[in-house]
Amino acid sequence: MADVPGAQRAVPGDGPEPRDPLDCWACAVLVTAQNLLVAAFNLLLLVLVLGTILLPAVTMLGFGFLCHSQFLRSQAPPCTAHLRDPGFTALLVTGFLLLVPLLVLALASYRRLCLRLRLADCLVPYSRALYRRRRAPQPRQIRASPGSQAVPTSGKVWV
């Protein structure tokens, strides 16, 4: 194969290094546990946001289905005292009409919360359990004494 100009060659010891088997197993368990905790928190947040925002539509649908004579024929006091079948039909129609816009609003607010809390950054890829990352050696910075000026080490100076 011909060398491609500008292509970087893999230098031995430059990339991630495989972990020991026991270390790999322990890290895999920890990574899985952390990802499950983040997923559980995501699910809890989703249920909380959807439950809060969709509550009016779900309440209307619940009372409409519970009290309408075509469905359950409940004789509970809230059903018989306040509305008749046309009122419960109106509750059903209004609940279904409100469901889609409130669902869009709830999902948009959940997405905004996830972005603000940066929940996707909490998920750890499984490759972290298999490989150790080597840190690139950082050049040591020499501190100048308070009375002297620091001399730039390279030929370029950014102003």
From Swiss-Prot:
One of its GO terms (biological process) is Wnt signaling pathway. The chain crosses the membrane at residues 43-63, 88-108. It is found in: Cell membrane. It is a multi-pass membrane protein. One of its GO terms (cellular component) is plasma membrane. Residues 137-159 are annotated as: Disordered. One of its GO terms (molecular function) is PDZ domain binding. Keywords: Cell membrane, Developmental protein, Membrane, Transmembrane, Transmembrane helix, Wnt signaling pathway. Its main location: membrane. Interacts (via C-terminus) with DVL1. Belongs to the TMEM88 family. PANTHER family: TRANSMEMBRANE PROTEIN 88 (PTHR28628:SF3), TRANSMEMBRANE PROTEIN 88-RELATED (PTHR28628). Inhibits the Wnt/beta-catenin signaling pathway. Crucial for heart development and acts downstream of GATA factors in the pre-cardiac mesoderm to specify lineage commitment of cardiomyocyte development. This is Transmembrane protein 88. It comes from Homo sapiens (Human). The gene is TMEM88.
